Amino acid sequence: MKMFKQDCEKAGIKVDSCISLLMPESYVGLPFMDVDKKENELRKKEQAKRELQDFADTIMKNVHGTERIHIGNWPRTNTRFLGNIFLNHIITDKHFRLNEEKCIKCGRCIKSCPVANMSADSNGFPQWLHTGSCLSCFACYHHCPTRAIEFGMRTKGKGQYYYTKNEK
């Protein structure tokens, strides 16, 4: 929390409280990372569902000074050292590739991009804009119904995850 507050203060943002939810794993951009197995995914979603109501009550009651965050192993190392490697070398759209034979031009990948870093080319195929705004969130990858999007060789054989409201 201390590092988070410091970073926010540098950006001119005052942090009064901090609450986090542990959600299913969706980052698949490194060789040793994949989506959670179904039982872990369901367990995390059930836990988040229980915590979310409590968090909503805290927010609605305007409670200040709340700190309920999940801190992983080696937070300083992960945040400062590995975080800088991610920011400078891994968070990019240059590794994304489209398999045009699999693509059905549905546009789900384009619509799912939270930073509007994709558009359709003149043939209707999705393309990355290479503007430096890509978050490497993999929303495009996870929302593709035909698995036409790949991140180099790093996503070969890996799972997909995205939340659907009625998913059990």
Region spans (language model):
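Active-site-proximal loop/hinge segments that shape catalytic or ion-binding/gating pockets
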Residues: 161-166
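A mid-sequence, solvent-exposed acidic-amphipathic segment
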Residues: 73-106, 110-111
